[in-house]
């Protein structure tokens, strides 16, 4: 019996896939089809897959061509599969010609001509493109423009800004500049907002009233009542309003959450997060920049609060804020520390744009702890550590686009399906806003 094996993602299974499977089947007596897992696709940078693994497996099974279906989960697995399953022929489409010649040591390699004029990429690209307008004053706008190029069906549009010194040359082009916020709304299907936090409410409300979807850098608003109003407005109009915290979309960060919640370090007793950066800004000297410059609690607070609330929840019993201000009006904090007490745990965060500290994340448990080195908010590696160092484990994951790429993809999926693909839940977004509102109201605060 001649065994044949082939691999693919098989997203949105189409005639081209079926023809390739038919020709692969004709090469032997028994066809094994390897379907790539969601994780493996993501690790390879293939982020535009629209169907889940099980949907893709069932689509392949429904063709009746596969005698056996396996899941491809890691780089180098093809060699293991060929040896383990006693495969005689490996086959794949001719667009990969030469790529898999190294497998000739283990079996015969055949490259099959693909059916021209049809591909999953083309099918995905035929969907209406969502034009994403950019609002604000931040170099992150350049990253959004760059990362949007990796998301099929999303196109970076014009930008509206009070200061273009942050912008890349491509965004500085006159054709990319919106004359006004209204002009930007008219030219966009959706918006990414990173303007001054106190402007978010008005800008988002106008966007929703005009039927635009919104991805807004956290905090979405400065008051919880405003957040509830905007959420309800988006829901009533069947629009997407998503809180943007890129760290939530890092594969490594998401995996460490699962491990921690799964009890790998026992009961979680403490979460400590630090986020600092040195910003060249003097609010007493630069009045123009103060129109859009973020203070430390707004710039870093949502990121530092994220693991605390995702691991311990939002039901803390008390909190204490200690802060040091740069200006006499007490708007710009150079440094802020917040301590939380929960019924069975504690947490703390340190944020600052006028101090520098080790930007690590430590999650302490009754059996061990998880350590994420600086900068933890760009997580691609972390360690699970125990009393006996021999039991320690290290985890590595590829980080593409600092999480922004996957965040944009989730935003687009939410727009197209009407489902919630956000990795930041509504109750966490609301609690982030509440903590920042308490900061602005000087509640539970000590000024140092």
Regions found by a protein language model. Name each.
Residues 33, 216-217, 241-243, 372:
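Hydrophobic residues in well-ordered beta-strands that form the structural core
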Residues 129-173:
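N-terminal Rossmann-like dinucleotide-binding module
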């Amino acid at each position: 019996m001649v065994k044949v094996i082939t691999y693919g993602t098989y997203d949105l299974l189409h005639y081209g896939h079926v023809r390739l499977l038919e020709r692969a089947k004709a090469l032997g007596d028994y066809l094994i089809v390897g379907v790539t897992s969601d994780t493996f696709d993501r690790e390879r940078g293939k982020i535009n897959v629209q169907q889940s693994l099980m949907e893709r497996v069932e689509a392949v099974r429904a063709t009746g061509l596969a005698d056996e279906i396996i899941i491809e989960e890691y780089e180098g697995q093809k060699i293991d599969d060929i040896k383990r399953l006693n495969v005689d022929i490996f086959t794949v489409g001719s667009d990969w010609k030469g790529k898999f010649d190294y497998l000739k040591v283990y079996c015969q390699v055949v490259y099959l001509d693909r059916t021209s004029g049809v591909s999953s990429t083309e099918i995905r690209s035929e969907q209406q493109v969502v034009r994403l307008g950019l609002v604000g004053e931040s170099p992150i706008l350049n990253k959004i423009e760059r990362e949007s190029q990796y998301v099929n069906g999303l196109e970076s549009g014009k930008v509206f800004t009070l200061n273009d010194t942050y912008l890349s040359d491509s965004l500085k082009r006159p054709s990319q500049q919106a004359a006004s916020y209204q002009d930007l709304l008219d030219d966009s299907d959706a918006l990414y907002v990173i303007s001054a936090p106190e402007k978010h409410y008005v800008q988002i409300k106008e966007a929703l009233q005009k039927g635009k979807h919104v991805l807004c850098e956290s905090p979405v608003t400065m008051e919880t009542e405003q957040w509830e109003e905007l959420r309800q407005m988006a829901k009533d109009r069947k629009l997407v309003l998503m809180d943007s915290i890129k760290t939530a979309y890092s594969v490594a960060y998401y995996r460490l959450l699962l491990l921690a919640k799964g009890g790998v370090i026992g009961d979680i007793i403490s979460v400590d997060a630090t986020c600092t950066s040195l910003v060249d800004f003097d609010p007493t000297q630069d009045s123009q920049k103060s129109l859009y410059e973020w203070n430390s609690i707004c710039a870093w607070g949502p990121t530092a609060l994220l693991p605390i609330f995702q691991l311990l929840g939002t039901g803390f019993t008390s909190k204490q804020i200690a802060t040091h201000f740069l200006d006499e009006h007490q708007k710009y904090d150079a440094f802020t520390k917040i301590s939380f007490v929960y019924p069975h745990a504690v947490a703390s965060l340190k944020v600052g744009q006028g101090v520098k500290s080790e930007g690590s994340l430590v999650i302490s448990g009754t059996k061990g702890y998880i350590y994420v080195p600086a900068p933890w908010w760009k997580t691609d590696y972390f360690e699970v550590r125990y009393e006996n160092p021999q039991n320690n484990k290290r985890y590595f994951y590829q980080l593409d686009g600092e999480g922004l790429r996957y965040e944009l993809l989730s935003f687009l999926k939410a727009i197209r399906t009407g489902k919630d693909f956000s990795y930041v839940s509504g109750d966490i977004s609301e609690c982030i806003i509440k903590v920042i509102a308490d900061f602005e109201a000087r509640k539970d605060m000590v000024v140092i």
